[in-house]
């Protein structure tokens, strides 16, 4: 959890926002996935948001669903994902690592065991996409017991009560949705979220990172101008992987270029 606090403190001192890429662990293969993650970090990623492939990802559009299918085809399991996480943490000791996943994977070996495993490999936060705040108590309790930040999604239509609850119980960062629906770079709609960010700040919530449909530097600038601490981009990155599966060198070059440009937008 402290890695997020350190990150936001360092970025504030430099007057920068955070750029956080999302990828599925093991896509398209475990070995190339580790190279991809090294490339994202070298190109300027401030933190990582990583998915554990799941067979029924309700919040994800086709791009990220296909990433999970590629990982499954490469034989990726939750066990392999945790081995990869341990390797990433060993190589990159300071970068915040967040998991974005689904409840079935948490339930599989028991909630407490799952968070213990996360702590053992150096994961900083967990966001469970299909658990609404109202049902989050057993998850957030176990998370805090093991020093893991529970991350909550703040939807664009959140009422005051929900904003207070998210501010009170969230740690690390707050995942601010650009819009309702599923993930996807092709779904551009960005709502004016200034009022939500103002309220979250008023209630002392963890810093807001805006996600869903973030695929261009200009959108990063808009998020920061609205008061967000940074932006998360997933589908646009995963699409680069999908389009270059057979040419890894080109894939890594395009990923580096994309992240460099998105990170540059956090500095203006």
Curated annotation (Swiss-Prot):
Its EC number is 4.2.1.20. It catalyses: (1S,2R)-1-C-(indol-3-yl)glycerol 3-phosphate + L-serine = D-glyceraldehyde 3-phosphate + L-tryptophan + H2O. SUPFAM superfamilies: Ribulose-phoshate binding barrel (SSF51366). Transmembrane segments: none annotated. GO terms for cellular component: cytosol. The keyword Lyase applies. It is an enzyme of class 4 (lyase). InterPro entries: Aldolase_TIM, RibuloseP-bd_barrel, Trp_synthase_alpha_AS, Trp_synthase_suA. Tetramer of two alpha and two beta chains. NCBIfam families: trpA. Belongs to the TrpA family. This is Tryptophan synthase alpha chain.
